[in-house]
């Protein structure tokens, strides 16, 4: 398949000795952006198993999930963890991650997936849109060369994952004869859930290890989350995000032009809240 013929990048391709530590060491907002992302990516194997179970019998999908998607997501986690350890070595990543994983595992349940395979592929497209947007914005938000390189590599991977999920979606949509109203419902619902349990869980456990005295301070954690969201919102590319969100609807160009503005408003007020 396209995108898999060329060799995927390796963590060894990143020269962590080039990190401009003095440039990012005191940037707490950046620390939380990178550390929380490293937790979520590192827990990808939990979610992969649920998806493999859900799509069991479709060897093309399950093979790609296990051999490509999961491996690349876990690599993202390892690379982000390595970056955290180089810049903030005092942060007890392993201890904090164990706490995160124990809670995160309770959110990864097959019964929480969409009711049909086509709709779950729709949801996957939304999630990949969110992650690609996150890492693109992270890359734009910093001038530190190693993080910029890493975030750009991850964003490129997420776009490639989106393309695979979208292709699988089209196959299942044809089989299920899915109408646009159901697709739109899944896009809206999954977009609303993008900043739900996993992101909140990651931030809480990073705070618990980084600033234990603030671990129970809901207002402080909310402020952190708001600053992180502001960074993403300031540095994203709305047009690209909007195009990715709308693509599963497969609307005629004329209709797409008409509904683009309200969907963009929805994206800005909910997806980026």
Which stretches of residues belong to each language-model region?
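Non-heme di-metal
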Residues: 1-273
């Amino acid at each position: 398949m396209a995108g898999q013929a060329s060799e995927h990048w390796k963590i060894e391709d990143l020269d962590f000795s080039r990190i401009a530590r003095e440039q990012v060491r005191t940037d707490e907002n950046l620390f939380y952006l990178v550390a929380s992302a490293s937790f979520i990516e590192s827990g990808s194997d939990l979610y992969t198993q649920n998806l493999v179970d859900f799509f069991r019998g479709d060897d093309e999908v399950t093979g790609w999930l296990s051999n490509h998607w999961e491996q690349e997501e876990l690599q993202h986690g390892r690379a982000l963890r390595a970056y955290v350890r180089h810049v903030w070595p005092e942060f007890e990543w392993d201890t904090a991650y164990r706490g995160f994983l124990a809670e995160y595992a309770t959110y990864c349940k097959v019964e929480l997936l969409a009711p049909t395979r086509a709709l779950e592929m729709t949801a996957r497209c939304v999630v990949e849109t969110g992650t690609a947007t996150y890492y693109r914005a992270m890359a734009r938000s910093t001038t530190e060369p190693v993080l910029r390189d890493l975030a750009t590599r991850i964003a490129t991977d997420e776009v490639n994952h989106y393309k695979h999920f979208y292709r699988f979606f089209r196959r299942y949509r044809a089989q299920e004869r899915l109408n646009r109203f159901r697709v739109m419902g899944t896009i809206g619902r999954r977009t609303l859930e993008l900043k739900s349990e996993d992101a909140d869980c990651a931030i809480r456990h990073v705070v618990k290890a980084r600033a234990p005295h603030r671990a129970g301070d809901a207002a402080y954690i909310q402020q952190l989350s708001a600053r992180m969201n502001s960074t993403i919102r300031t540095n994203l590319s709305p047009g690209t995000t909007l195009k990715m969100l709308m693509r599963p609807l497969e609307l005629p160009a004329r209709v797409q032009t008409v509904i683009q503005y309200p969907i963009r408003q929805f994206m800005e007020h909910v997806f980026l809240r």
